[in-house]
A protein has these predicted regions:
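Conserved cytosolic headpiece of P-type ATPases
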Residues: 1-730, 735-738, 795, 812-882
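Membrane-water interface at loop-to-transmembrane-helix junctions
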Residues: 732-752, 781-793, 821
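Membrane-helix interface motif
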Residues: 260-267, 758-775, 843-846
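Generic alpha-helical transmembrane segments
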Residues: 708, 753, 789-806, 831
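Core segments of transmembrane alpha-helices
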Residues: 676-680, 745-757, 833
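Helix-coil boundary and interhelical linker segments in multi-pass alpha-helical membrane proteins
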Residues: 688-697, 763-789
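Alpha-helix capping/termination and helix-coil
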Residues: 604, 656, 660, 755-767, ...
């Protein structure tokens, strides 16, 4: 509000007193389910129910064997193993969910830190929304979210969207009791927390904060919606179903095969058969637990959460989880100019005022026909509000004019707020007994409203504008009129009188960000099309395009640039024919951006769009990824998926790189997990037919599951992003997550591992091997089963084959060596945990893991011989690279 400075606001003592009495402006989150209740919820899983039933039966048999047959305490190892299976299957998923919740918790508190303009101790200041207290005097402008409940003190054309509270999209707010709407849910001078200013500006006094607001009374913890089903989600569901069906079939074959083997090779005894049948069911169920990728969704969530946290360090605040991976599939970026491509550091480059107009008229017009403020923080002036208007206030200060003194001295009687449709704003000012109308806006609009052209011609003004615009400068036109009588000047947000006098033009520069040309080139090399959508003139927009190497005068033509008016005139058919060729839309309006997004989507493009204003919300919601700016309005941020904190286009390029790298990391995890699935399922299936004893016990398979689901997810999710992904073209949405090269790797590696392990299994079952050095020297004889030492060898060889294969999975599609560890400290640490864990299990696990300690020379043989897996991978990568 131009003359709102006469409010003193609260002082420091009053602020502290109000905060103690009325509390802070933060909503208390709704109570969540307790951790215990969430953990118990995991036991509703059908697989866990089967494990619980099997565990109870196993415990009953163990009690019978211990008390009835006096077989000793070792009989309880099986039920303890089942208990471990249950705790692992439930505990890991529970832990990952809690971890993911903590990763996302910060995102749901971001709004409490949104800046709010207040008057305190007679000075305009900016404070976080959480610090607003009862009694604060708050400025509100178009696009703002009301920070707390309060009363409107002054307002100009204020319309508020109360749909989040009452369902009413537009409610007019006023301080005039004669204009109050008797049918409104809340009085017309009351403003409610969480509602949004769609038009106008004003001043309000806070009357309630936090839980005492109307919004707080009906508040339920509003979490970010991460339920959007993306192509990746659908592919993962399909992959999970495919693996699940295969594992169920293999489990059924194991049960049938082992029962058939028992009935044909052992004299039937009910107690023995019951024990054997229970063991068979346990093997089948455990195989399902291992094979079914119940950890896959959580592993993806962990990867997303990990990426979200690290993307924040590159100025990308991800609000909606799916946007992480969708950015990697983006094919078109529709970007604003101001603040995104440019520095948004507006400064008046030059002014051209015509005629013999007194300076005080120009100064009054700039100071009073404005909603911007200047805030002095540590001797540095900061613009609060529109940066273009702020540049004009700074220009006044350079000339020794105190804009705040003018606002104290004069009164704004009527106003028309700026809108993208009108492209101008106007104020009727009463000062020193004079009444003056001031108009400011797009020069061509303002000039057309003037009767007195101050000795200029349209051609002269157009030439002047073209000169500035060709230097990528923003231009504003100014006009005024002295009002002689008391007639109403503004009617229905329209100037009702004529005879305006043209004052002149101000050219305002906003340099291109230094890192933007390289960032634009990077995303274009990545196969992504960049389009500029701006409210500036064609000349200004084209010059910015030249500076960032998007526009080339030698190759581009009028087919590649269009104005908002021309864009609107295109029918849908013509638009679809032209839309891919359009590089720049100048003088664009908000709905032009939304229509552009929808047209591109119709052609199968994946669109990311930037926006910072309230009117950008439709386009931000329509795009696959909406990118709001850090200093954008609350409405824009709420409609977006990612907030670019520093407003820079370079950060958008970083988001694309993260999205593509994230997708690759998920592919690597699936590559590793699916290979282990194939090997484990085939080994257990064949083992059931080759002998009565399963080569992998319940507890051993659960360790494999821990490696496969949790450790591998953590290791591969922690891999840093790769710059090389920006050399690839965007992936097609229809591409299955397991591509042909992955299938070759999975099937080739899986079948090779199976062949090696099944030969070893057969050899172990038909010899009395006591050291791996005996391989080749012992004669294969009759079936003898597996000794504890042979079981330990087989289990360790199986694990270390997967261990080395994890290095191959990590190096997949990177073009780098599996031993390139720069930036991969997390991967190295987890690999060491797996290796040390296996050594401890074999040496200390005893009967619980059904293992015995392995000789040192056998450890060396296993580690060296299984490492051939990674050396073969290195050789294949070297061949592919050359």
């Amino acid at each position: 509000m131009s003359n709102a400075k006469h409010y003193d606001g609260l002082d420091r003592e009053e602020i502290d007193s109000r905060r103690r009495e009325y509390g802070t402006n933060v909503l208390t989150p709704a109570a969540k389910e307790s951790l215990l209740k969430r953990f118990l919820g995991k036991f509703k899983d059908p697989l866990i129910v089967v494990l619980c039933v099997a565990g109870a039966a196993s415990l009953g048999i163990s009690f019978y064997e211990y008390f009835g047959l006096h077989l000793g305490g070792t009989v309880f190892f099986e039920p303890v193993g089942i208990l471990m299976a249950i705790l692992l299957a439930t505990g890991i998923g529970f832990w990952l969910e809690v971890k993911a919740d903590r990763e996302f918790a910060i995102l749901n508190q971001v709004n409490d830190d949104q800046p709010v303009q207040v008057i305190r101790s007679g000075q305009v200041a900016q404070v976080p929304r959480r610090d607003v207290v009862v009694g604060d005097i708050v400025f509100i402008n178009t696009g703002d979210e009301i920070p707390a409940d309060g009363l409107l003190l002054e307002g100009v054309s204020i319309n508020v969207d109360e749909s989040s509270l009452t369902g009413e999209p537009i409610c007019h707010k006023t301080t005039d009791p004669a204009l109050f709407d008797s049918d409104a849910t809340y009085p017309s001078n009351r403003l409610m927390r969480g509602t949004k200013v769609m038009e106008g500006h004003g001043v309000m006094e806070i009357t309630a904060v936090g839980d005492r607001t109307e919004n707080g009374k009906v508040f339920t913890a509003a979490q970010i919606d991460n339920s959007v089903k993306t192509p990746l989600d659908r592919q993962l569901v399909g992959l999970g179903k495919m693996i699940s069906r295969a594992s169920y079939c293999i489990a059924a074959l194991i049960v049938i095969g082992r029962i058939a083997m028992f009935l044909t090779s052992v004299e039937f005894d009910w107690i023995t058969f019951t024990t054997f049948f229970l063991q068979t069911i346990m093997i089948a169920v455990t195989l399902i637990v291992v094979a079914v990728p119940e950890g896959l969704p959580m592993a993806v969530t962990l990867s997303l959460a990990f990426s979200m946290r690290r993307m924040l360090k590159t100025n990308n605040l991800v609000r909606k989880m799916h946007a992480c991976e969708t950015m990697g599939a983006t094919t078109v970026i529709c970007t604003d100019k101001t603040g995104t491509l440019t520095q948004n550091r507006m400064q008046v480059y030059k002014t051209d005022f015509f005629g013999n107009i007194p300076d005080n008229v120009i100064y009054e017009g700039i100071a009073l026909n404005s909603t911007a403020q200047l805030d002095k923080i540590e001797d540095k002036l900061t613009v609060l509000g529109n940066p273009t208007e702020g540049a004009l206030l700074l220009w006044l200060l350079e000339r020794g004019v105190d804009y705040s003194a003018l606002r104290e001295k004069c009164k704004v009687a009527e106003e028309i707020p700026f809108s993208t449709e009108r492209k101008y704003m106007a104020s009727v000012v009463e000062c020193d007994g004079r009444k003056t109308l001031y108009v400011k806006g797009a020069p061509e609009i303002v000039y057309g409203m003037c009767q007195d052209k101050s000795g200029t011609t349209k051609e002269q003004v157009d030439l002047l504008l073209a000169n500035y615009q060709n230097q990528a400068m923003r231009t504003l036109g100014f006009a005024y009129k002295e009002i002689e009588d008391s007639s109403q000047v503004i009617v229905d947000n329209t100037i009702s009188i004529g005879g305006l006098v043209f004052l002149g033009i101000a050219a305002i520069s906003d340099p291109v960000r230094a890192d933007v040309p390289a960032a634009v080139e990077e995303v274009r090399n990545a196969g992504i099309t960049v389009k500029i959508v701006t409210g500036d003139t064609p000349g200004t927009a084209k010059e910015i395009g030249r500076q960032i190497n998007l526009w080339n005068d030698a190759t581009d033509s009028q087919d590649n640039i269009i104005t908002g008016t021309e864009f609107e005139a295109l029918n849908d058919k013509d638009l679809l024919q032209r839309v891919r060729d359009i590089k720049i839309i100048a003088r664009a309006r908000p709905m032009d951006k939304k229509r552009l997004v929808e047209a591109l989507q119709t052609l199968g493009e994946v669109v990311a769009v930037t926006g910072d204003g309230t009117n950008d919300a439709p386009a931000l919601k329509a795009a696959q990824v909406g990118l709001s700016m850090g200093d954008g309005t609350s409405v824009a941020k709420e409609a977006s998926d990612i907030t670019i904190i520093d407003n820079s286009f370079a950060s958008i390029g970083r988001a694309v790189m993260w999205g593509r790298s994230l997708y690759r990391n998920i592919q690597r995890f699936i590559l590793f997990q699916t290979t282990v699935n194939i090997v484990a399922c085939l080994i257990v299936l064949c083992g059931a037919f080759m002998g009565l004893q399963s080569p992998l016990t319940v507890t051993q398979m659960l360790w494999v599951n821990l490696i496969m689901d949790t450790f591998a997810a953590m290791a591969l999710a922690s891999l840093p992003p790769s710059e090389k992904v920006m050399n690839d073209k965007p992936r097609s949405q229809s591409d299955f997550i397991i591509n042909s090269s992955m299938w070759k790797f999975i099937l080739g590696t899986g079948l090779l591992f199976f062949a090696v392990l099944i030969v070893l299994l057969y050899y172990f079952e038909h010899t009395d091997l006591t050291s791996l050095q005996q391989i080749g020297s012992l004669t294969v004889g009759e079936f003898k089963g597996l000794s504890p030492y042979e079981l330990s060898l087989f289990f360790t060889i199986f694990v270390f084959l997967q261990f080395w294969n994890m290095f191959n999975a990590r190096a997949f599609a990177t073009g780098k060596s599996a031993f390139h560890f720069k930036g991969c400290s997390g991967f190295v640490c987890i690999a060491l945990v797996i290796a040390l864990g296996q050594i401890l299990i074999v040496n200390c696990g005893g009967e619980f893991f059904n293992v015995v300690p392995i000789r040192l020379d056998d450890w060396i043989i296993i580690i060296l011989s299984t490492s051939i897996v990674v050396w073969i991978g290195e050789l294949l990568r070297l061949i592919a690279k050359s």
